[in-house]
Amino acid sequence: MPFRFGTQPRRFPVEGGDSSIELESGLSSSASCNGKETSPNRQLRRCPGSHCLTITDVPITVYATMRKPPAQSSKEMRPK
């Protein structure tokens, strides 16, 4: 059986920013091949292997506030 585009299932789930037209046709556009994809709501960037999506242009303070402070042990909480 000859190989045809679009006959193999996607290896990874559809993510925000993926084009349903591209998925149906099985053809890749230059936008998806250059490592950047755009969405009306946010900028998305794919890693070179198309394994992950990264939201670009997010201030570092957002990441800093998302981190949880390290859990304190009971020894640190008791005053000496």
From Swiss-Prot:
Listed InterPro entries: FAM229
Compositionally skewed regions (Polar residues) per UniProt: 33-42
Superkingdom of this protein's organism: Eukaryota
Region called Disordered, residue ranges: 1-45
UniProt record similarity statement: Belongs to the FAM229 family.
Low complexity: compositionally biased ranges: 15-32
Any Pfam family the entry gives: UPF0731
Coiled coil residues, start to end: none
Name of this chain's protein: Protein FAM229B
Transmembrane region(s): none
Gene: Fam229b
